[in-house]
C-alpha cells in the first residue's frame, strides 16, 4: 500500500498545532493528538511498515521518548527487534554515549553496547525531524557499534529547519509522512 494523498491529508489533519508553545512565536506540532486517534496512529505505522518491509531491515532504533511510540510498533510490523536510544543513565546494561549540540547547550544519548551487531541494517524512527541533531547523534551511536544506517523515518518533517539536509550529508535518506513549515 503506497500512501495516498487522502491518507496523508488525514494524518496531517490529525496533528494539532499549538501557537506560542513552548515559547512565544513557536507553532508547535503536537504528534500526541495523532496518537489519540487509533485510525491515524495505525495508519502511520502501516505506512512506515509498508515502505520498509522489503528493505532488509534487521533492527529499528527509536529515540527517547516519542520515537519509542512509533519505532516499536514499526519494528513489530517488520518482525525485527527494537532498540531504544535514551538520555544518560536510563539504560541498565553497559552503554556508549554520544554528545550533541543543542541551541544553547549540549545533551547526550546512550545505547546498549550489545543492542546493535556489526552489519545490522538499521532503520531510525522518530516522531519529528527538525534540525536533525538528535538523529545525527543516534546514527553515530549505531555506526560506532558496526550497524549500517541509510534511512530514517519520521511522522513529521519541519522541512525548513534543515534536518533533512543535515542527515543527507551523513548518507541518510529521510522519509516523512507529514511535512510542515518549522515556524
UniProtKB/Swiss-Prot annotation:
Instruction: Drop me one GO molecular function for this one.
Output: adenine phosphoribosyltransferase activity
BP terms from Gene Ontology:
adenine salvage; AMP salvage; purine ribonucleoside salvage
An example GO CC term for this entry is:
cytosol
Q: Does the keyword Transferase apply?
A: yes
Provide the protein's localization: Cytoplasm
EC class of this enzyme? transferase
Q: Which CDD domains match?
A: PRTases_typeI (cd06223)
Cite the entry's keywords alphabetically. Answer: Cytoplasm, Glycosyltransferase, Purine salvage, Transferase
Catalytic activity from the UniProt record: AMP + diphosphate = 5-phospho-alpha-D-ribose 1-diphosphate + adenine
* InterPro entries attached to this UniProt entry: Ade_phspho_trans, Adenine_PRTase, PRibTrfase_dom, PRTase-like
* Predominant cellular place of this UniProt entry's protein: cytoplasm
Q: What is its EC number?
A: 2.4.2.7
Tell me the route in metabolism or biology where this protein functions: Purine metabolism; AMP biosynthesis via salvage pathway; AMP from adenine: step 1/1
- Tell me if Cytoplasm is a UniProt keyword of this record: yes
> What functional role does this protein have?
Catalyzes a salvage reaction resulting in the formation of AMP, that is energically less costly than de novo synthesis.
What the record says about family reads: Belongs to the purine/pyrimidine phosphoribosyltransferase family.
Subunit (UniProt) = Homodimer.
Q: Write the protein's name.
A: Adenine phosphoribosyltransferase
The gene coding this protein? apt
Amino acid at each position: 500500500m503506497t500512501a495516498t494523498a487522502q491518507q496523508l491529508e488525514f494524518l496531517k489533519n490529525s496533528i494539532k498545532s499549538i501557537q506560542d508553545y513552548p515559547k512565544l512565536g513557536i507553532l508547535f506540532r503536537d504528534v500526541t493528538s495523532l496518537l489519540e486517534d487509533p485510525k491515524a496512529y495505525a495508519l502511520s505505522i502501516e505506512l512506515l511498515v509498508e515502505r520498509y518491509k522489503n528493505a532488509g531491515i534487521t533492527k529499528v532504533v527509536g529515540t527517547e521518548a516519542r520515537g519509542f511510540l512509533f519505532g516499536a510498533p514499526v519494528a513489530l510490523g517488520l518482525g525485527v527487534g527494537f532498540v531504544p536510544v535514551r538520555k544518560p543513565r536510563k539504560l541498565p546494561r553497559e552503554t556508549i554515549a554520544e554528545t550533541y549540540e543543542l541551541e544553547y547547550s549540549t545533551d547526550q544519548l546512550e545505547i546498549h553496547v550489545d543492542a546493535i551487531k556489526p552489519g545490522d541494517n538499521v532503520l531510525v524512527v522518530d516522531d519529528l525531524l527538525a534540525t536533525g541533531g538528535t538523529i545525527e547523534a543516534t546514527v553515530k551511536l549505531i555506526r560506532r557499534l558496526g550497524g549500517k544506517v541509510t534511512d530514517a523515518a519520521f511522522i513529521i518533517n519541519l522541512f525548513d529547519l534543515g534536518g533533512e539536509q543535515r542527515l543527507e550529508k551523513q548518507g541518510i535518506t529521510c522519509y516523512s509522512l507529514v511535512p510542515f513549515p518549522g515556524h
